[in-house]
A protein has these predicted regions:
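N-terminal catalytic or cofactor-binding beta/alpha core of small enzyme domains
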Residues: 2-173, 178-272
Length: 272
């Protein structure tokens, strides 16, 4: 895609990589924002939690589940950095004021339900509800983190969507995730339910095998989610729509069916 990002030090990995087909043959783009496995030194130095504890917040191995996408003519965008370090399926400035000892700029969204649940762009809590950082964060460092990881990822994704739409007249973005097998009262997931609810209070539901999220019909054409539902159900999987996950930032930000860009979030139950 011509989007190689250079950093001040070679020790820092690129924020993403793209697995591309020899030639893109379908108007599909796959993205895996929560499967990154790089836990930077600055994160590990600032937390009392182990890498194993932090990794429970991730959608581990989801990028591998979709690794065959290029063989079928579609590109796959894979995040490199751990979700506990930075959540790419959030607005860029969903930051928790309690994590800072300085006043945050006006453009920061510190009042979303995701932030309230400890699961903003820079998560405050790990999957088990433990606090990630022992001390306050510096806003300048967080801004640099966003510039280094968040914005390059989304610039790349936006370019992939644009290129696909130009080539095929449309683009279907599949945002790939995994989910715990059952809901609980800890804020372990935190993606959108009912347009932004953190998912707390769902109770201990037994979830389906697959949850498809289209923001209640606003992010993709109904024919697309209907087709996905029929196809997956036909494989013997138990499929739910928009419950408990209707789709996060990526789904509602990129999904513009009226312009030919459709976004669908897929959650795969980890018990599978």
């Amino acid at each position: 895609m011509g989007l190689t990002h250079m950093h001040d030090t070679d020790a820092l990995p690129a924020p993403y990589d793209v697995a591309s087909p020899v030639r893109q043959q379908v108007g599909l783009v796959f993205a895996s924002p929560h499967s990154g496995q790089h836990y930077p030194e600055d994160l590990m130095a600032a937390t009392d939690l182990s890498k194993l504890s932090l990794s429970r917040s991730a959608d581990n191995f989801v990028d591998e589940l979709f690794s065959d996408a290029p063989d079928h003519g579609a590109p796959l965008l894979r995040a490199a950095y751990a979700r506990a370090y930075l959540d790419l399926n959030r607005e860029p400035w969903e930051l928790d004021p309690q994590m800072f000892d300085e006043e945050l700029p006006d453009h920061v969204n510190g009042t979303s339900l995701r932030v309230a649940g400890g699961l903003g762009t820079i998560p405050r809590l790990a999957a088990d509800g433990s606090r990630i950082y022992r001390d306050h964060l510096d806003f300048a460092e967080v801004r640099e983190r966003l510039n280094r990881v968040y914005f390059p990822y989304h610039h790349c994704l936006a370019r992939m969507v644009e290129d696909t739409q130009l080539a095929f007249g449309h683009c279907v973005l599949i945002d790939c995730h995994s989910m715990p097998s059952a809901g609980g009262m800890t804020p372990g997931r935190g993606d959108d339910i009912r347009f932004g609810d953190s998912g707390r209070g769902i109770g201990r539901d037994q979830r389906g095998d697959i949850v498809l999220g289209d923001r209640f019909g606003t992010a993709c054409a109904p024919e697309l989610i209907d087709c996905a539902y029929r196809t997956l159900s036909g494989l013997g999987l138990r499929v739910q729509r928009n419950n408990p996950y209707a789709g996060g930032f990526t789904t509602y930000h990129y999904g513009r069916p009226g312009t030919g860009v459709h976004a669908l979030q897929i959650e795969i139950n980890r018990r599978l």
